[in-house]
Amino acid sequence: MAIILLDTKTINRIAAGEVIERPASVVKELVENAIDAGSSEIEIKIESGGCNLITITDDGGGIEKSDLELAFMRHATSKLSDSELIEIKHLGFRGEALSSIAAVSRIKLSSKANGASEAWSISYEGGEKIGELIPYSLPQGTHIEVRDLFFATPNRLKFLKTERAEIQSIVDIVNNLAMINYSIGFTLTSGSKKPLKYAKQTSLFSRLCEVEEEFQDNSLEINEEEDGVRLTGHICKPTVNRGKSDMIYTFVNGRPIKDNLLVSAIRYAYHDFIPSNRYPFATLHLEIPYDQIDVNVHPNKSEVRFQNKRLIYEIVRRGLIKALSTRTGNSAVSNIDRSRCQGIGKETSGLPFDVSESQGNDNHINNGKSRETKSERELYERRPNPFENRLMKESNSPSVGKKDLSERSVLFDSGIQKSLSQAKTVVLEREQIDLIENHPLGFARCQVYNTYIIAEARGKLIIVDQHAAHERLVYECLKQKSSIKRQKLLLSEVVEIKNQAGMEMVEVYKDKLFEMGFDIQINSENKVIVKEIPAILGTIDVKEMLIDIVDRLMEIEDMLPIEDKVNKILATIACHGSIRAGRTMKLEEMNVLLRQMEETPYSGQCNHGRPTHIEMKLSDIEKLFERR
């Protein structure tokens, strides 16, 4: 077959395939143009998910009459010159959007430039100009109508999703652009449904709370800077998380981007607080010198290349860890509202119109609820053996909680050996009042289902998951100890490791496990002898614990720093070494646990990311009973 030169019409349609993939692509390109034009209000209207009609109206600088036809030519732009290619500051710069949209739709653009006496309109259909420029009634800015998207390339329609899914994709685009451009007002209307409207704001946080209300009461501020790179934004406490990453918003120099490096750094910062299959809520803005970043990677302009990836990763990781290291890590899950008590799921999209079918199987904010494995759940709920019911000793004196965590007791068979025997007397009424009024977790009133502690604090009720709470205490105590005391087993335990990979893990980490309190000797090709275990664990099932540790070692990524690998092993040890659901506790024990939670970092979540406690404000309880 002979080689031929493609005509302009065909070239434009091929190019449009990269730029315009779906209706949301049209919205993205045209709204970005409106932002670059200096608009203060942008209105978007769609019909049939954007396939039948998309209109964008702005009050920006507009386009001169003499430039209207030129604007539809490929690679025609007012935003870029040769000298600016390495310092791109606008959202749009390739000059492909209008020509690509015109190639696959029927488009009409009307605009009135600043200082012009009247507006003018131009139309294209399938890439060809229709008629001449005509006058148009428009006070200021630009109005664009895109009809019958992909009529010229009907095969593309087969690859579109449902109408609701396309609407959701458009909403995601608008949310992203509205988030970072908080000084601009945005309105999105789908058919006759109630509009999604964002008023002009004076700060990113104000806009953030408009888009996702979970940030209102659960936000941690981020502010980090190094070598001319600045990171700002907000993240949510670990107890607010979900099963997919759609609540992670990342921006670079005001441009919404999707970058695995940033997501990886965010997930690393949270890895000690939420399960591996959960994602946090985060909105981060990186300001980077323009000559240190390349945004000209893909026609959709959502990908970038960083000159110094290591620096970017470290700034994000460090900034988030600093925020998560504040005492807010001890906070409870947000208050339980009335709708939750009635079992009504809270929508997370913030949409006035229904897009539920496109949300997948995990529509709702999890607030720390993880998908536990069967073995983890069985371990969590296992009934204690008789030895676990033995009370260990800890003083309930005023000095408790003021010592360094590594010197303090954690409780019971799984804890450091101190006594509760001095706390046998009933707490006096005045002491109860002091605890309720002056301590965040208040005074324990009772235990229900031998699993949850009910405590009264000032103006609120606290419900504590005893296993989850104690697991975090044991874990943090283990992490802070430079050397862990060992206890010799009365009878050494022989443990069979059923696969060769597991035995290799034991050999590789044998010395590190010794530092953690385990004296392990390899007996044969598939058996090891455990002679000593960490004293903090008390009486446990040694075989089950070692097998769990080996399984965990095989799951750990090789690229993780050794400190992270150690912490993951310690988390497994802590899970085995903490009190179980089903363990009966005395009132004195409950209150010691509450005091230690108040003094322990990150006590708001267990090692798997579950909440350790929740709170209900008195005002919310009164609303449940219609007293308010």
UniProtKB/Swiss-Prot annotation:
GO molecular function, one term: ATP hydrolysis activity
Keywords, ordered alphabetically: DNA damage, DNA repair
Database matches in Pfam families: DNA_mis_repair, HATPase_c_3, MutL_C
Keyword Nucleotide-binding part of the UniProt annotation: no
Amino acid composition bias (Basic and acidic residues), ranges on this chain: 369-393
SMART domains named in the record: DNA_mis_repair, MutL_C
InterPro entries, sorted: DNA_mismatch_repair_CS (IPR014762), DNA_mismatch_repair_MutL (IPR020667), DNA_mismatch_S5_2-like (IPR013507), HATPase_C_sf (IPR036890), MutL/Mlh/PMS (IPR002099), MutL/Mlh/Pms-like (IPR038973), MutL_C (IPR014790), MutL_C_dimsub (IPR042120)
Gene Ontology terms describing biological process: mismatch repair
Top-level taxonomic group: Bacteria
Entry function: This protein is involved in the repair of mismatches in DNA. It is required for dam-dependent methyl-directed DNA mismatch repair. May act as a 'molecular matchmaker', a protein that promotes the formation of a stable complex between two or more DNA-binding proteins in an ATP-dependent manner without itself being part of a final effector complex.
UniProt record similarity statement: Belongs to the DNA mismatch repair MutL/HexB family.
Name under which the protein is recorded: DNA mismatch repair protein MutL
Organism of origin: Wolbachia sp. subsp. Brugia malayi (strain TRS)
Protein encoded by which gene: mutL
